Amino acid sequence: MKIAIIVREETMLRCTGGGCLNAFFQRIDSFARYADREDVELVAFTHNGGDLEKKIATLKKKAVDVIHLSSCTRGKDPNYEALAQRLAEDFTVVGYTHGGEIGSTGPAIILEKAGKSPVTGSE
């Protein structure tokens, strides 16, 4: 299973990505769903700025299965829902990386790739 993490561009001006990467490598928080899998590979770590459609095309070429939106995107980006919906046209989307599935701004968006049934964070 191939994973990509998309973070908030403005946050990346001061963030090293440590929280997202720690959660991935420790298989905690949003990545706990993969704890029993050995085939999980992080193939991209990028921000939401720039040419999103070009990034989507590249992620599709890399055969990404799931995109995790960073927790800072959920908490601070007014386009969080629209971004998740657009990405769900081509990928399964998990709308947070570290911390709880239910954050201070509400529950994280969890979407299956378009055409599939919605999933919950516990699946």
Predicted regions and their residues:
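Conserved mixed alpha/beta catalytic, RNA-binding, or beta-rich assembly cores of soluble enzyme
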Residues: 1-59, 70-80, 93-94, 99-123
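Short, aromatic/basic amphipathic alpha-helical patches
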Residues: 79-89
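Structural motif
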Residues: 65-66
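Active-site charged/polar residues at nucleotide-handling catalytic sites that mediate phosphoryl
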Residues: 62
